Regions:
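Active-site signature of alpha/beta-hydrolase-fold catalytic machinery across serine-
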Residues: 132-136
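Gly/Ala-rich beta-loop-alpha elbow adjacent to hydrolase catalytic centers
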Residues: 119-130, 147
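Catalytic nucleophile-loop/oxyanion-hole region of alpha/beta-hydrolase
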Residues: 76-110, 114-115
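Short glycine-enriched, charge-decorated loop/helix-capping segments at active-site entrances
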Residues: 53-54, 82-88, 268-269
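The alpha/beta-hydrolase serine catalytic core
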Residues: 137-275, 279
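N-terminal cap/lid segment of alpha/beta-hydrolase-fold proteins
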Residues: 1-35, 297-298
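Short, surface-exposed "cap/lid" segments of acyl-processing enzymes
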Residues: 26-72
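Short beta-to-alpha linker loops that shape the active-site pocket of alpha/beta-hydrolase fold enzymes
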Residues: 43, 67, 72-77, 149, ...
């Protein structure tokens, strides 16, 4: 029987920055998993705020018969390197490596069992990384998106605003030092809210889009949004993205869940309805495979 939970360091690539912290969740009953899920965390402090929710969801998936791999990206959490060491391409490579590690762990745990369907489960910025890495993943994948951002430019702008917020609170940078935006434009690394940001990460993030991979036939994309109050429908921006995915052959579905926006709350909070909806999304038969686009907004109570 496979160990239900295991934390370990894996070598993503050679060199001093190659070690990645991984957490493996196997199906609780020890059977071969229904699917293989790789979690891709959010950006900077959003990752830290979401640690608990990611762990709770991973355990829920394992209890439902799925296998999950969580991996800290380069410079994040307990993986090698500092945040400022990472580029956008490094993180894309990490997602590809995480899939390789997860598949190898599956083969080791259940020799002879066929590789199950693969899901890339992203949170916020992690959704952008998932779509960027997908063309390099053999056999294709499905997507589970938690509060995805349609483009990385918005993520970067929101992060850089933290510098302005700090200045308003009397924590302005030293006189004569360029703003973070100007520093990045000049090709220099900058520090914002305690995080060192490299130009290679900032520029790659800024150019990222939530674009559908080409191989969409018989593939699924589940988009789950969380809001404090019930939402009648997906936002116009989300609807446009969903339509684009549907036109590319993906079966795309949106659902809105009532709950706290845990990745930005002051205190660590849980969104139990998001966990329940995510677990059901992987097995729900409501998605019509091959349809241009199916948008089903269901608000959890």
């Amino acid at each position: 029987m496979a160990a239900p939970f295991d934390a370990f360091f894996a070598t993503a690539r050679p060199g001093p920055l190659g070690q990645r912290l991984c957490i493996w969740h196997a199906p609780h009953d020890g059977s071969a998993p229904k699917s293989l899920i790789v979690f891709i965390h959010g950006f900077a402090e959003e990752m830290n705020k979401s640690r608990r929710m990611a762990a709770l969801q991973s355990r829920a998936f394992a209890a439902a018969g799925h296998a999950v791999l969580q991996m800290d990206l380069l410079g994040c959490g307990d993986s090698a390197g500092d945040f400022g060491d990472a580029t956008w391409q490094d993180w894309i490579d990490d997602v590809v490596d995480a899939v390789r590690i997860a598949r190898a762990r599956h083969t080791q745990s259940w020799p002879g069992a066929a590789q199950p369907a693969l899901w890339l489960w992203g949170h916020r910025m992690g959704c952008l990384l998932a779509t960027a890495a997908a063309p390099r993943i053999e056999g294709g994948c499905n997507f589970l998106f938690w509060q995805p951002t349609p483009n990385g430019k918005a993520v970067l702008q929101q992060f850089l605003r933290l510098e302005t917020a700090a200045a308003l609170m009397g924590k302005a940078p030293p006189a004569g030092r360029p703003s973070a935006k100007d520093g990045l434009a000049a090709g220099s690394g900058v520090e914002v809210a305690g995080y060192r940001l490299s130009p290679g990460l900032a520029h790659g993030l800024e150019a990222a889009r939530l674009a559908p991979p080409a191989s969409g036939a018989n593939r699924r994309m589940e988009w789950l949004d969380v809001a404090p109050q019930a939402q009648d429908a997906a936002s116009p921006v989300a609807q446009q993205v969903l339509t684009t995915w549907g036109s590319a052959g993906w079966s795309a579905r949106h659902r809105s869940i009532v709950g706290p926006m845990f990745w930005q709350t002051t205190e660590i909070e849980d969104a139990p309805d998001l966990i329940a909806t995510s677990s059901s999304a992987l097995t729900s038969g409501a998605v019509r495979l091959g349809s241009p686009c199916f948008v089903d907004t269901a608000v959890a109570a």
